[in-house]
Amino acid sequence: MKITSIKLNKNGKYVVTIDNEKYNLYQDTILKYLLFSKKEIDNTLFENIIKDNNFYDAYYKIIKFVSIRLRTENEIRKKLNTLFILKKDQDKIINKLKEQGYLNDELYIKSYINDKINLSLEGPEKVKRDLLKNGFKEEDILKYLCLFEDINEERINKIINKKLKANHNLSKKMFIVKVGNDLRNLGYTNYREILENIDFDDKDIYQKEYDKIYNKLIKKYPPEKADILTKQKLYTKGF
């Protein structure tokens, strides 16, 4: 087999003609195998050229993939799987990315936590769970989870106040239960004392709910019984 021509293409790759067949090769491949016009190559060398060029092709696709935003190792491996890259070659690409600074666990964790703080109301425990699912080590996560410490109470109060404004029918007792569940699902833990001390007068809500239930029951029962049944229903609602 013989290389008959090598021409630089507009996309930065080289069009290499070998025995009248054209191949798009990366500069890395050209330099690694010292390819030049009229060079003779055997089948083994040809196979290695194609194999390595496929490796570089996957590598540069991943470079483009990580240039859009920071990626986790899991995300990169999933992308490499879609490109049908073998495990050993995946490991080589991952190591190369780490060496060149494209893949940095601590940088990703810090950036992820800052985004969650600035763009969401998620709490530290949920953020920690999500990062663990992405394959990060707990000790690395804990280094930056402390970013929540000074703002935790402020964020909890913000969520509670938002829920208070939207509450039109819950008693204080049921409100505390519901919002407590919401806060726990959002990843907060130290919220109980804050919730217990909220300024919440549910008298108006009680009266509104009483009137709504009573007006339905009075159509079926005498006033005294309607009153008793109404209060029983309100009791089950935490009033």
Predicted regions and their residues:
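An alpha-helical, amphipathic repeat domain used for nucleic-acid recognition
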Residues: 1-239
